[in-house]
């Protein structure tokens, strides 16, 4: 509908101004998040009623008859939702799974249907010009093993911070971003052609650096998810021709351990430059090597759907530790993007990993449907004060609910921090036994299949 100001208009005549005090993009983002929350609350009515935690939080604040609203047309529901002050319900809105910054060009427009389908909050970038970013000296010193006064400088786009709690941050545009998933339209399109099947998940683990062979144990970590069958092959010191041939074969995932330099992926007999490849049939990948962004983009442009790469030089010890955690996170059902999110707090500051292509891909399903993440905030002999977070996946997106059987039948909307719980030792063990979960306590990272409440309390 033509007009001087952006607005939302329903077929019943209701009009809502989208050019609010916070500006158009901020207002649209608020409308999306507020409408989502309140419609989820309304949908707890009907034939299959749900005891929803978020309804308990907001119902007493609102003068809304949700039982009556359930039977009303969507336009009437929307008018009711937007009659509520955003601040009244803001603290009950789930952490948003994805915010996408879009370079406002014609080429970027084709990405909009995909990010809208993910219910992402979309922003345009007024100044997307890449700027120099310096790698922290500590990382370079660790990598080189000597002091240096010359930090490495690379040009990246630095998206503006998001003003609300968001888990994933993505960028659509030409230049590489800092701390965001570089989406590409072609990788999103190719993802539509992927049909799930019952065949084993095929993974190639390639180690082209004998000094990093400790990371080869990842082959065991990928198989910890007993809901799936895995076909894992190990490869060491692949030649350029052998590596090129491997990438041409159909596979679900490549975990590369080794080195990348300006000429490409380092092989015993030279370099494999992925930007020269015409056909890659590995769906997703982890290039756990120094400054692997360009080679990762080469894989995506040649056919991969998405992957995890590094932006700077990474010390071998840090890369090995990160590779082991990535394998566990992906096997636990995390997407490429949420794997990076969960890992970021547990590597040296400045050593940055990011995703390229479709960062919303997952390798397999979590036992819980949505992968979990636990933070033990405080403990004593009888109680663990625990924060539980969860994340959306391609199969269990926004609107999914979880029940922990901790407090009867209460369910929680998935995405981000759900709540804090005071758990007894037996309740904590029940949570730890239910799935493979990363657990953070006193600045250390544990895994639920390696510990019990007795180790923590």
Predicted features along the sequence, with ranges:
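Proline- and acidic/polar-enriched loop/turn elements at helix boundaries
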Residues: 185-187, 237, 258, 311-312, ...
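Short acidic, S/G/P-rich loop/turn micro-motifs used as interaction or catalytic elements
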Residues: 15, 209-214, 237-242, 259-263, ...
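A domain-level signal for caspase-like cysteine endopeptidase catalytic cores
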Residues: 97-253
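Caspase-like cysteine protease fold
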Residues: 271, 334-457
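N-terminal secretory/membrane-targeting helices
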Residues: 1, 197, 224-227, 241, ...
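Long terminal accessory regions outside catalytic cores
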Residues: 1-118
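Catalytic cores of nucleophile-dependent amide-cleaving enzymes
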Residues: 256-338
